[in-house]
């Protein structure tokens, strides 16, 4: 299984995480003093959301909704490492999209980009648009741009 995901840029972040499963629970975030904001945001409403990819495993979307989460950003896919730069759909993308939608969560998507040329960026955009065609998203499409 590991070799299947070695080309996935997020897999390496997952392995480096101190948590053995790469997950922080909502209860950990909402603990007594663990979630704070600067005073300039006093009086501003907080909206809770999560982003998910294959590494979160099977998700009980009803539990997510009941925990107070209002939106979810789901990874559509990523560009693999190396010269091939293969565009890969997240194995859980459609399952997560269907489950989150059925649970009544607002849904958006993200793509983990490794594009280094305009042509690659355009190919990634087409890849995303092809996969979200026919779905009704309530949140934007995001591009996760990180140096790896």
Predicted segments, located by residue:
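Substrate-binding cleft of extracellular glycoside hydrolase catalytic domains
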Residues: 42-148
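Boundary/entry segment of secreted carbohydrate-active catalytic domains
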Residues: 1-75
